């Protein structure tokens, strides 16, 4: 991208997209916000249902879905930017997707993670270790990490493990 330009990104946990009205409202909201990239977590679509997620002006929609209606992540890239896809990496459980490509000859990588509720710190650590060779200064990592980083972020009095503390 040229100097002085930016990439606008929205990231949302949508808590399921199986209801048509919810998909329609989400599509309208994305169009109104008008970002270049939109990352969705917890889409909960089965692989055979992913064609149901459509947004006018967004042909590049990439999913990672489990076999059941659990987890699921998506990266949507607006038609307004000339994003050339080079590589897509997904996990089979639908917890992360990585899209590598370029915008105006400049490499970009977007990683969208939805960590499982149980074992989230270990999952995040392992995922980042697995993709370490793909991460560089042009990598954007977003997600729902299901991990409180400070006691203030926790709703219960449960002790926070040292590995997740900031």
Q: Which residues make up each language-model segment?
A:
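A shared catalytic/ligand-binding motif for oxyanion handling
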Residues: 1-166
């Amino acid at each position: 991208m040229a100097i002085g330009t930016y990439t606008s990104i929205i990231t949302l946990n949508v808590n399921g997209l199986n209801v048509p009205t919810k998909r329609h409202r989400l599509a309208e909201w994305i169009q109104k916000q008008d970002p270049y990239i939109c990352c969705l977590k917890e889409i909960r679509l089965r692989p055979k249902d992913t064609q149901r997620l459509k947004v006018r002006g967004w042909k590049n929609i990439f999913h990672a879905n489990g076999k059941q209606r659990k987890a699921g992540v998506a990266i949507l890239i607006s038609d307004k930017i000339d994003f050339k896809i080079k590589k897509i990496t997904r996990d089979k459980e639908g917890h992360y997707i990585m899209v590598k490509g370029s915008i105006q000859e400049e490499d970009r990588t977007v990683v969208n993670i939805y960590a499982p509720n149980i074992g989230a710190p270990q999952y995040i650590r392992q995922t980042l270790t697995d993709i370490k060779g793909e991460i560089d200064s042009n990598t954007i990592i977003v997600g729902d990490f299901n991990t409180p980083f400070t006691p203030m972020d926790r709703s219960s009095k449960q002790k926070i493990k040292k590995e997740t503390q900031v």
